[in-house]
Amino acid sequence: MVLVSIVVPIYKVEKYLSRCVQSLLNQTLKDIEIILVDDGSPDKCPEMCEDYLKVDKRIKVVHKENGGLSSARNAGINVATGKYIGFVDSDDSILPTMYEELYNVINKYNCDFAMSDYERIMRDGRENLKSLNIAKGYYDKNRIIKEIYPELIMGRNLDYGPLLSVWHCLYNSNFLRQYNLRFDEE
């Protein structure tokens, strides 16, 4: 069992895929598996995935019929062996320390989930740091209801909608499996 499985759904992203995969290979946390889920992409992505498979033993490839983003993420969950699971969209790149930092938070607080800020890079190259107005730390059920829910619903970044997304989080895989948490494919 590896420490962290990183699921990457792939569809028509050959322009961005190399940058994404390289950012995953550059993680300071080395005990990872990178699961590239080719969601029936009609471009060169399937071949690119096979090439990556030869580059690093931490890479796994799943080829499947196109079923959409949720279906691809679920396919990745199904083959993940990590104690924790993260998701990265294939047109994104992440900082080298992202998963090490998220793991350290989970380990420190013994929690099932950790979330980071992220930086949105616009087409014109402008960068915007996006974060929830939430203090770092452990949140029990009452604190989540009181402090987190209101921020998710009426956060200060309404121009982009709520910032709760899977691609800047790390999850305990046992928690996901225990409650059969999957992405809705409907």
Regions found by a protein language model. Give the residues of each.
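Nucleotide-sugar donor-binding/catalytic module of glycosyltransferases
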Residues: 1-186
